[in-house]
Amino acid sequence: MLDIKLLDIIACPLCKGKLSYKKNSNELICKFDHLAYPVIDGIPALLKVKARTISSDEE
């Protein structure tokens, strides 16, 4: 589970845009780059190699 306060200070490492949290999949979503970054043990894994590409209907 992610501490929601982190959403105010973290950004997508690629585009520097805002991230949103998807609780059911425990991922941070970048709508601009269409990437989902996993949150592992409460820690965001903001590395492109850890991200998965998402379709527009998943956002």
UniProtKB/Swiss-Prot annotation:
Give Gene Ontology CC terms.
cytosol
Q: Entry's SUPFAM superfamilies?
A: Trm112p-like
What does UniProt give as the signal peptide span?
none
**Looking at the record's lineage, which domain of life comes first?**
Bacteria
| SS bond partners | none
Pfam families on file = Trm112p
Family annotation (InterPro entries) = Trm112-like
Annotated PANTHER family? PROTEIN PREY, MITOCHONDRIAL, ZGC:162634
Q: Tell me its family.
A: Belongs to the UPF0434 family.
Instruction: List the protein's name.
Output: UPF0434 protein Ping_0902
**Organism from which the protein derives:** Psychromonas ingrahamii (strain DSM 17664 / CCUG 51855 / 37)
